[in-house]
UniProtKB/Swiss-Prot annotation:
Keywords annotated in UniProt: Disulfide bond, Glycoprotein, Immunoglobulin domain, Leucine-rich repeat, Membrane, Repeat, Signal, Transmembrane, Transmembrane helix
Gene label: LRRN1
UniProt-recorded name of the protein: Leucine-rich repeat neuronal protein 1
Topological domain ranges for the Cytoplasmic compartment: 653-716
Disulfide bonds: 447-499
CDD domains tied to this protein: FN3
Glycosylation sites recorded in the entry for this protein: 69, 96, 106, 117, 385, 517, 582, 611
Lineage: superkingdom: Eukaryota
Domain annotation LRRCT: ranges: 371-424
Source organism: Bos taurus
Compositionally biased spans, kind Polar residues: 702-716
GO CC annotations, alphabetized: extracellular matrix; extracellular space; membrane
One Pfam family, short name: LRR_8
PANTHER family the UniProt entry points to: LEUCINE-RICH REPEAT NEURONAL PROTEIN 1, SLIT RELATED LEUCINE-RICH REPEAT NEURONAL PROTEIN
Length: 716
């Protein structure tokens, strides 16, 4: 019995397939327009429910009108990429039509599409046409429409009642048009809208209450609109919003007030905005936020203290490909217990503090590769056995500094270096090297530094005044983060401002030159070299740093001394803790230019030069030399008298005796003559060539040469 039931079921299945095949064949042969494809295809409703639909596919046929012999059973009509600009009544008999695709055609007006009486239509594609406006009630017959794609057109005007009748609309794509305003009245007719994409429109700005009628909206995309600011009440009414994108705008700060009005937000995209810093309160009390993206921000330099605060459900933070992001405060995260993934790769970070990582109890993975990492005490935690955090792409983690470790893998270096304290280093790009401000404006200079122990930050003004957090001044104010505020700047405030970061190990500095209305009053020189003593064969030079801009324990990373005249040029590296230098083995009565160049760890350089002429050799003889010379002259005089008498006595001697006498006199005179100065004082380079071939040849290379002058300097 079971066998017969199985055979009967199989027979019925074959019969059903045969009938379907015959039906499809009949549809294709008798009711399918020429060149089109007519068949039953899978179809998904706007709610992603699977169905099968009778589909007529006439895409890419260069049609100028809709085929006339369409079956009334057609449910999906695809006419994409044709040249249709107008319909007559070809659609009026398609009572079962649920999806219509007119994308990439030549419509300029919605009325010309012929949408009357399409009461079953749920999805309409009109993207990439030439539509310029949407008039009142232009879609009122589409009472069941759930998806409207009208993006990538030329729409500049939408009337207040253009969407009237679309009470069931769930998805609206208006992006990439020419809209200059967003009118909240548009949305009065779409109370059930869940997804709105309106980016890439040249809107003048977002207004307060712009989206208030959209209480059911779940996703809002405001990308590529050149927005510079989001008003505090712009997002009021979006109580169901879960996903928000401000991608590729011109926001210079996080719209924290507006974000507080979307209590259920889960996904926030702020990527590709010129936000300068993420500061305290920017992301605070966003209780449902799960993922945050702050990638590709060309101006982002720092994530400050408590920038992310009380985000109990945040699980993923992406802050990658920010070319200036060089500083994350050790207390950047507060009450972020659920964070599992922290992506910080491809930035300008020199380090991430251990305390930052320890504040994230559920952190599972971190990505800090492709950063110019500073391999010293700040990142020793990376090699700690106490952490179970997985490092993404660890083989791409290389040291950028100190110089002796550059290019080596981080973990290999940290095994060798176990120091617990290290010098401060001011983060690169936190403020520019030069500014030109308008008179009366307020200036903010953000200085950030990393070190162990944590450095103190203060600023020094062009007049040498030290500005600290405790300083009381109407002109200057310093935040605990290191941001100097200069109120209502005037021309007399122009000049050199120096940030100093200092701890027990030493200090680091960075300078910004500020012009006001193009004027710079400050002429102070950071580094000054001067001649302390001049002799015929040596010069003693000294230098000092302007006390207005440097601290006494500032350490340079390198220093170079160069001496130059038209005949010789020599360069030597100077120990960085030296403030005096004795240049020896010089030529008398010769002009020289002596230059000192110093560089800090940021490769910022300061240079100072001085011109000097060595003394004449006659003034350089000491007393012992004079006594020796006098004695030598007396001996030579006596000998000369004896030789003169002998010459008269043997005048009549034989020629060979006269010859021998002449030879003896010549030999004696060679022993007693003065040595030329250019032999007594050979060029500086010869002093360190020792017994080399150059000594034998008696020649000097006049090309600039790197030499060791460790024997000729004096310690301060």
């Amino acid at each position: 019995m079971a066998r017969m039931s199985f055979v009967l079921a199989a027979y019925q299945m074959v019969l059903s397939l045969l009938m379907t095949s015959l039906t499809g064949s009949s549809l294709q042969s008798s009711e399918c327009p020429q060149l089109c494809v007519c068949e039953i295809r899978p179809w998904f409703t706007p709610q992603s429910t699977y169905r099968e639909a009778t589909t007529v596919d006439c895409n890419d046929l260069r049609l100028t009108r809709i085929p006339s012999n369409l079956s009334s059973d057609t449910q999906v009509l695809l006419l994409q990429s044709n040249n249709i600009a107008k319909t007559v009544d070809e659609l009026q008999q398609l009572f079962n039509l649920t999806e219509l695709d007119f994308s990439q055609n030549n419509f300029t007006n919605i009325k010309e599409v012929g949408l009357a009486n399409l009461t079953q239509l749920t999805t309409l594609h009109l993207e990439e046409n030439q539509i310029t406006e949407m008039n009142d009630y232009c879609l009122q017959d589409l009472s069941n429409l759930q998806e409207l794609y009208i993006n990538h057109n030329q729409i500049s005007t939408i009337s207040a009642n253009a969407f009237s009748g679309l009470k069931n609309l769930l998805r609206l794509h208006l992006n990439s048009n020419k809209l200059k305003v967003i009118d909240s009245r548009w949305f009065d007719s779409t109370p059930n809208l869940e997804i709105l994409m309106i980016g890439e429109n040249p809107v003048i700005g977002i207004l307060d209450m712009n989206f208030k009628p959209l209480s059911n909206l779940r996703s809002l995309v405001l990308a590529g609109m050149y927005l510079t600011d989001i008003p505090g009440n712009a997002l009021v009414g979006l109580d169901s919003l879960e996903s928000l994108s401000f991608y590729d705008n011109k926001l210079v700060k996080v719209p924290q007030l507006a974000l507080q009005k979307v209590p259920n937000l889960k996904f926030l995209d702020l990527n590709k905005n010129p936000i300068h810093k993420i500061q305290e309160g920017d992301f605070k009390n966003m209780l449902r936020l799960k993922e945050l993206g702050i990638n590709n921000m060309g101006e982002l330099v720092s994530v400050d203290r408590y920038a992310l605060d009380n985000l109990p459900e945040l699980t993923k933070l992406e802050a990658t490909n920010n070319p200036k992001l060089s500083y994350i405060h050790r207390l950047a995260f507060r009450s972020v217990p659920a964070l599992e993934s922290l992506m910080l790769n491809n930035n300008a970070l020199n380090a991430v503090y251990q305390k930052t990582v320890e504040s994230l109890p559920n952190l599972r993975e971190i990505s800090i590769h492709s950063n110019p990492l500073r391999c010293d005490c700040v990142i020793h935690w990376i090699n700690s056995n106490k952490t179970n955090i997985r490092f993404m792409e660890p083989l791409s983690m290389f040291c950028a500094m100190p110089p002796e470790y550059r290019g080596q893998q981080v973990k290999e270096v940290l095994i060798q270096d176990s120091s617990e304290q290290c010098l401060p280093m001011i983060s690169h790009d936190t403020f520019p090297n030069h500014l030109n401000m308008d008179i009366g404006t307020t200036v903010f200079l953000d200085c950030r530094a990393m070190a162990e122990p944590e450095p103190e930050i203060y600023w020094v003004t062009p007049l040498g005044n030290k500005i600290t957090v405790e300083t009381l001044s109407e002109k200057y104010k310093l935040s605990s983060e290191g941001t100097l505020e200069i109120s209502k700047i005037q021309i007399e405030d122009s000049g050199r401002y120096t940030c100093v970061a200092q701890n027990v190990e030493g200090a680091d500095t960075r300078v910004v030159m500020i012009k006001v209305n193009g004027t710079l009053l400050d002429g102070a020189q950071v580094l000054k070299i001067y001649v302390k003593q001049t002799e015929s064969h040596s010069i003693l030079v000294s230098w000092k740093v302007n006390s207005n801009v440097m601290t006494s324990n500032l350490k340079w990373s390198s220093a170079t001394m160069k001496i130059d005249n038209p005949h010789i040029t020599y360069t030597a590296r100077v120990p960085v803790d030296v403030h005096e230098y004795n240049l020896t083995h010089l030529q008398p009565s010769t002009d020289y230019e002596v230059c000192l160049t110093v560089s800090n760890i940021h490769q910022q350089t300061q240079k100072s030069c001085v011109n000097v002429t060595t003394k004449n050799a006659a003034f350089a003889l000491d007393i012992s030399d004079q006594e020796t010379s006098t004695a030598l002259a007396a001996v030579m005089g006596s000998m000369f008298a004896v030789i003169s008498l002998a010459s008269i006595a043997v005048y009549i001697a034989k020629r060979f005796k006269r010859k021998n006498y002449h030879h003896s006199l010549k030999k004696y005179m060679q022993k007693t003559s003065s040595i030329p100065l250019n032999e007594l004082y050979p060029p500086l380079i010869n002093l360190w060539e020792g017994d080399s071939e150059k000594d034998k040849d008696g020649t000097a290379d006049t090309k600039p040469t790197q030499v060791d002058t460790s024997r000729s300097y004096y310690m301060w």
